[in-house]
Structures are given as C-alpha cells and as structure tokens.
C-alpha cells in the first residue's frame, strides 16, 4: 500500500526546494533508496528507527522500509479550474493523490518576489482552495444533473447520493472545503468517497519560514495553524532553505550537528513524511527474519487477516493465526527465541486489531 502525496503551492513559495530536499532524504534514512519515476515524481522512504534497531539484533540481508510517493505538482495561477496556466494538468494530478502537502510562504525576502506582491499565506491558501472548490462544484453539479431524476423516482441509492451531493454543494458555495462535511451512515460515507472530490482529500499545510524561525515559527504560521485546526487539517513549520543545507551534508553525524545548532531534534523533511503518513491513518507492522527486516503499511484499525493480505492475497484467504511480538519486547529480549521463552509472543486470531510496530508472523493454509 503506497502512499501518494502531491506537493502544491503558488510560485516562489519554496515548493520545488522542498521537493528537492525530499529527493535527497535518502541520506537521512541510512542509505535507503530513492528513485525518480519521472522528473517530478520520487519514491522516498518513511523514516522508522525501529527497523535499524531490529536489524542490529537480527542481522538481515537487507532492510526494506515503507515508502511514500511524492509528486511535485506543477504550479497554478488564478483560473486553473477553467484551464488557465497548467490548470487542467494540475487538477488532474491532484485527483490521483491520496493527500495534499500545501506549501505556504511564511517568510519575508525582498530578493524573492511573490506572485501577488506581498506575503500573505492565508490569501495564498484561499487562491488554491478556490480553484479546487470550483472544480469540485463542477463535479457536483454534473453528478446532480444525472441523479436527481432517478432520486425523484424513488431509487434509494440515488436518494442517498443526491443528499450527499447537496451537502457538499452547500459548503462549497460558502467557500469551504469538502473535508469539513461529515456523514453518519455507511451508505453516505461510501457515496462521498466515490466522488473523489479534490477538497475532501486530507491536507497538510507546510509553513515555509526563514532559518531563524525554523524552531518556533512566526505570526504567519500561528494564523495558518489556527485555520488548519478549524477545518480539521494539519499544519507544520519547516525552513526549506535549512533543509536544503542539511541535504547537502554527507554524513548522518554532520546532519545531526547541524540540527542541534538550530535547536531541532529532527529534520523537517523527516517530520513531514511522518505527518503525511499519519494524515492518512497509516501505520506499520514489521516482519523480521534472516533475509530481511521489512516495514509493511496498513490502515489503522485493520485486523490480522487484512494485514496478512498486504503481504500476499493468499495469506488473507487462508489465514489461520498470527504470531505477534511487541516491538519493545523484541528489543528487551533480543531475539524471537528469547521472546517465546519468556512467554511474550501472542497467538492471535482473525479478530486481532494490529497495532503500530507489531512484529508479525502469519500462519496460513491455501
């Protein structure tokens, strides 16, 4: 299950700098691989110190982290929803992503011009929001035209869909994003999910600040954080220029020293990837053996058979049981055999809800 995030933002906000830093993040993840699929698409590893700790005990042939696909989505201008600039391509690329990383300029620099002449991240956010909302309204109105007659004739599914469409239409016409709407019934939730609205996607607002403000942010970032909370989104502070400097350093030790100088415990890039992962309610279970220590991505709340299916569909179909070791127990006892001997290995059935960091071994029969 690969996570796909799209990075968006107006020109000169630091979007491409941030993407380039993400492209260089291989050096911060113990030389895990980074590859470029297209010039604007990269696959990057999800930082997870647990894999390194386990590898020190297991001595596997390789370490395989979870991955995240990052797409640098072409900049847009006002009128993108009507196809101006790179509008149609921009909006099409966003539709294919699971989550949006929205970079906002929260720094002053007279050498870097702003497309609108002044620094105002709230205004910048609203420009992109408006384009996405207009495109969503277009989708809603097109669907409504098709479904209203069927709903009026008494079709139950059409009635549910029409109700969902009208709820979205109301908030979008108020200049709000679709993600603020919630539905109670499973039928409504399914209908909403199948619309693939742009403004219903989870969003992480990334406040790009100066190096001096990397730790505590500024007045701009406080406004963005408050606004994000109001719409059920996430926000974080990052200094793309600082991240660019970190990316140029060769060793892990040099990077850590650099971070300490700025009073930072972890690079902004690492924090960003982890936040994006959490944004989609994704978690990690681990398999550990002589061949490899590997992270597997699953949705929070999934049960053991569903997680087995992440490895192979046959594992889910023929699921018998799962042998589960808690990460802390593995670290404490030092090996699978020692965990067994201490009676700390759990034998779980099909109703077991997998927890983040569980070390799993699945028994199945095909």
Spans of model-derived segments:
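Conserved G1/Walker A P-loop phosphate-binding module
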Residues: 1-113, 141-143, 147
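C-terminal-of-GTPase-core extension/linker across diverse P-loop GTPases
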Residues: 2-8, 13, 19, 146-353, ...
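Short amphipathic alpha-helical segments
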Residues: 30-31, 112-116, 217-219, 249
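Flexible beta-alpha connector loops of hexameric P-loop NTPases
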Residues: 76-82, 117-132, 151-156, 212, ...
